[in-house]
Structures are given as C-alpha cells and as structure tokens.
Amino acid sequence: MGLTTAQIKAIQDHWFLNIKGCLQAAADSIFFKYLTAYPGDLAFFHKFSSVPLYGLRSNPAYKAQTLTVINYLDKVVDALGGNAGALMKAKVPSHDAMGITPKHFGQLLKLVGGVFQEEFSADPTTVAAWGDAAGVLVAAMK
C-alpha cells in the first residue's frame, strides 16, 4: 500500500513552503530528536560520537551529517508517488555496512512529522501523512 495523492500533496506542500528554505535547521532538529530518543545510536556517527548531546547543534561534523541526510530526504520527498522507495532502498547497502538498518531509518522517519509540527508549522494531516510515509518508505527498503 502506498501513499494517497492527498498524503503526497500534504507532505510536498509543507516541505516546499516550510522546510525547503531551512534544510539545515530542519535536519538538525530531526536528528537531535532522534538522538535524544535513541542516544545509543550516537555511536554510529564516529565523527561526532564523543560530542555530548547538548553540543551537537554547534558541531560542524554533526551539521554536515544532518545536511547530507536532509538533502537526500529532499530528493525522496520530490520523488513521492514515483521512485521514492527505490531511492530509500539504494541506501541499504552502504548503511548496512555501518550497522544501520531499515529499522533505524524507520525510527528516524517516524519522528519527522512530530518535529515538523513542533517546529515547522505542520498541520495534523501532514503529521499523519509523514507517519504513513515512514512505513511505506521503510517497507520499500526491505
């Protein structure tokens, strides 16, 4: 089961109006929420794994990593309704080698809607669409 046209529109409209112009801020917030929820996963990121959580947002390696992730997510959002699943699946081999599994992607993606609601004016429809998108995108990775 994929996303509906209305869900894709909700995600893309919010993205283009509220996220596209502040990718770094959105990325930093999503990752911070993720690492707060799953602090043990900080070990996956050797370039900043020794940085305390409160110091991450000002760490250049953290900022570079979060920007890399959100730039790719930007491509995935553009491709919703098309090859978004294939784009996600393409990340499996390189991340699997680091011990990062589709489960980790799912944990991160499930937080996106909430972060967008808290910090980037996402409405409940968009938040719910992101919840469904997390499941659809992770399923495509398997």
UniProtKB/Swiss-Prot annotation:
Keywords: Heme, Iron, Metal-binding, Oxygen transport, Transport. Residues 2-142 form the Globin domain. SUPFAM superfamilies: Globin-like. Signal peptide: none annotated. GO terms for molecular function: heme binding; metal ion binding; oxygen binding; oxygen carrier activity. The keyword Nucleotidyltransferase does not apply. InterPro entries: Globin, Globin-like_sf, Globin/Proto, Mb-like_M. PROSITE patterns: GLOBIN (PS01033). It holds the Pfam family Globin. The keyword Plastid does not apply. Heme b binds at residue 95. Hemoglobin F-I appears to function in storage, rather than transport of oxygen. Hemoglobin F-I binds oxygen non-cooperatively and almost independently of pH. Homotetramer. Belongs to the globin family. This is Hemoglobin F-I. The lineage of its organism: Eukaryota, Metazoa, Spiralia, Lophotrochozoa, Annelida.
